[in-house]
Amino acid sequence: MAKKSKIVAQKKREKLVAQYAERRAELKAIMKCPTASLDERMEASRKLSRLPRDSSPVRLRNRDQVDGRPRGYVGKAGVSRARFREMAHRGELPGITKSSW
């Protein structure tokens, strides 16, 4: 089980990323635009750097939806590998069967 503070911080980051996603996309588009002047690009860069650090999607971490474990994340199921194994054994994941040959 991850620390509650880490899970809360992650939720806060997710809200910030969603809140600033459109603004960040606009500024990045200006920075990548070949027709924009150097001053416009520099101003967009300055504005982007003034946004909250946690509003960047790079700072998000994939976490287990059940207990927040940050390592061993299985993307399709949204849980950690340990939880994935438990759920598969109990038959809670449709279409997942234990291999046998």
Curated annotation (Swiss-Prot):
One of its GO terms (cellular component) is small ribosomal subunit. One of its GO terms (biological process) is translation. GO terms for molecular function: rRNA binding; structural constituent of ribosome. Gene3D superfamilies: 1.10.287.1480. Residues 61-70 have a biased composition (Basic and acidic residues). Keywords: Ribonucleoprotein, Ribosomal protein, RNA-binding, rRNA-binding. Residues 44-74 are annotated as: Disordered. InterPro entries: Ribosomal_uS14 (IPR001209), Ribosomal_uS14_bac/plastid (IPR023036). Belongs to the universal ribosomal protein uS14 family. Binds 16S rRNA, required for the assembly of 30S particles and may also be responsible for determining the conformation of the 16S rRNA at the A site. Part of the 30S ribosomal subunit. Contacts proteins S3 and S10. This is Small ribosomal subunit protein uS14. The gene is rpsN.
